[in-house]
Amino acid sequence: MLEELFRLDGKVIVVTGATGLLGRKHAEAIACYGGTPILLDLSQQAVDNFANELNAKYKGSSVGFSVDITNEKAIKNNAKLIIGRFGKIDGLVNNAANNPKVEDSKEVNFSRLENFPLDIWHDDIAVGLTGAFLCIKHYGFMISKNPNGGSIVNISSDLGLIAPDQRLYKKDGISKDKQNVKPVTYSVVKTGLIGLTRYLATYWADKNVRCNAMCPGGVKNGQPEDFLKEVSVRIPMARMAYSDEYQGTLLWMLSDASTYLNGAIIPVEGGRTAW
């Protein structure tokens, strides 16, 4: 039956940043459609609580691990634990990333490129890009050993396809050199994930491992009304996304409904990048 193509029964899928706003939605979609989400985040208590919540609701066997994805040894050991417990890994959702926000002072706005701290640059790249690489190196390699391969989904952004419109953050009465901006690392990380996706799409294709990127737009999550209004006029659908609006796309990308999808960069952003 056609609807069965979207099912994830028996599939073991690693989700990084699993207790964040979208990470929770990704994991919930996997569990709802019969898969076993392996929840990775920094807090063991948070992933344990979320795993218990998912298992109670969907009668699954989700499990959580505290893993720093910038630590290769931790990832390598965790991959062995997962294989020891479940025997395989079928999918990976590279979702973890810093949300780069830099505290400003009265004298200097550190979000601006000319003032951006090098240590924050290194940290953002380490989590969002190096972390994704390390997860692919170890979890993805395990996927490549499956007889039927599997699926890797990198969570990029509409801002991996277009530049951030810094006018959204402009405030009256503040000089240009003090205005807030979307930090440079966000664009670098999200664009880098697109390049990584294309590389992987050709690297393990002979082992039936597909790699694709989703480029979600911004999610409505308590932003000020004036900001929501400014963003909305830049989106053909005239609104930001709801947090559950990416679940269907993710299920399609992970499931057998998309077995010929490979190397695709899929915008899910209300049409923003079409303008």
Model-derived segments and spans:
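Conserved glycine-rich Rossmann-like NAD(P)H-binding loop of the short-chain dehydrogenase/reductase
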Residues: 33-49
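Catalytic loop of short-chain dehydrogenase/reductase
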Residues: 114-118, 153-192, 197-206
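Amphipathic alpha-helical dimer-interface segment in Rossmann-like NAD(P)H-dependent oxidoreductases
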Residues: 80, 97, 118, 123-147, ...
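A conserved structural motif in NAD(P)-dependent oxidoreductases
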Residues: 235-246, 257
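Canonical Rossmann dinucleotide-binding motif of NAD(H)/NADP(H)-dependent dehydrogenases/reductases
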Residues: 5-38, 200
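Short, small/polar-rich loop/turn modules that mediate ligand/substrate recognition or access, typified
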Residues: 205-210, 261-263
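Catalytic Tyr-X3-Lys loop
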Residues: 90, 110-133, 153, 186-188, ...
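Short C-terminal tail/terminal secondary-structure segment
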Residues: 2-5, 110, 174, 251, ...
